Structure formats: C-alpha cells, structure tokens
C-alpha cells in the first residue's frame, strides 16, 4: 500500500511572538538569541533607530508618519495612534498563517502600552488565539506610569484569550 500525505508547505510559522515597544522588543531579542525553533519572532516599535540596531530579523515600524521614526514619548495615546496608522501592516503581518500570537510589552510607557491593545484587537478580528505577557512598572517609577500601565493592561486584556 502506498500512502500519500499532503503536508502544506508553510513559509511562515503558525506561532508568532511580537515584542511591542522597548520592553517587549528586549524580551523578544532575548528569546530570539535562545535559538527557539518553529516560532517567528517579531519586534514592533515606533523608534526606527531601535529597530535598526536589533538583531531580531523580523521588524515592523509603526506610526512612521506620526512619530517621524522617533519613540512615542511615554504617551500611550501616541503609541495607539501609531498602531492605528499601521493597522493594515499589522493585519498583513498576522494574516500569514498565524494561529497563535504572544504579545509581550512593558506597560507604562508609550508604544507598548498604546500599541499592544491595537495589535491584540487585530489578532482577535482575524480569529488568532492571542496571549498577552506584559510587565508592570515598579512602585518607585511613579504613580502616573503605574496608572498608564494599569489602563493599558485593561485594554489589552479585552482582546486577549
């Protein structure tokens, strides 16, 4: 007897890990250096210089027009607007056979706090199983940063499984 198996030829992994902002990008850079296979690692940032200096091969710059390649200045609304500006790029990136997405970000700053919920929303719209893994600021980093982080975590959790 002969058996024939039709195995789909995939060029992209079905599991993606995206690091959003500086903190998330640092986490993904560390994971990428560990040599984990069958996972696609991506860094996403408003800061063009930070993207260019990273060793992670898959990069997505968001909000290039809004931020002119600079960071979000610790302003989550600016990070959110940057992600909305690049929503179709995010959708195209995720719409390449992705079945599961891990979003990692440091909450309390601008890009991670503001953009991670938008990325999760796009993933949710595409029916992708989405997990958020974030860090919160230390108490000594201040009340404002802590409040921004808590708001960002609430928004992110609305779009995560």
Pin down the residues of each PLM region.
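Tubulin/FtsZ superfamily GTPase core signature
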Residues: 1-161
């Amino acid at each position: 007897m002969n058996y024939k198996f039709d195995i789909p030829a995939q060029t992209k992994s079905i599991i993606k890990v995206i690091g959003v902002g500086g903190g998330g990008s640092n986490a993904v850079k560390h994971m990428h250096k560990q040599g984990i296979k069958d996972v696609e690692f991506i860094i996403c940032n408003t800061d063009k210089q930070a993207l260019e200096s990273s060793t992670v091969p898959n990069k997505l710059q968001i909000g290039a027009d809004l931020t002119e390649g600079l960071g979000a200045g610790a302003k989550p609304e600016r990070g959110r607007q940057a992600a909305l500006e690049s929503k179709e790029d995010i959708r195209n990136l995720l719409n390449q056979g992705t079945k599961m997405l891990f979003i990692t970000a440091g909450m309390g700053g601008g890009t991670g706090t503001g953009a991670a919920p938008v990325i999760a929303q796009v993933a949710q719209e595409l029916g992708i199983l989405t997990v958020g893994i974030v860090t919160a600021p230390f108490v000594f980093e201040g009340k404002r940063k802590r409040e921004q982080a808590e708001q960002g975590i609430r928004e992110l959790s609305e779009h995560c499984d």
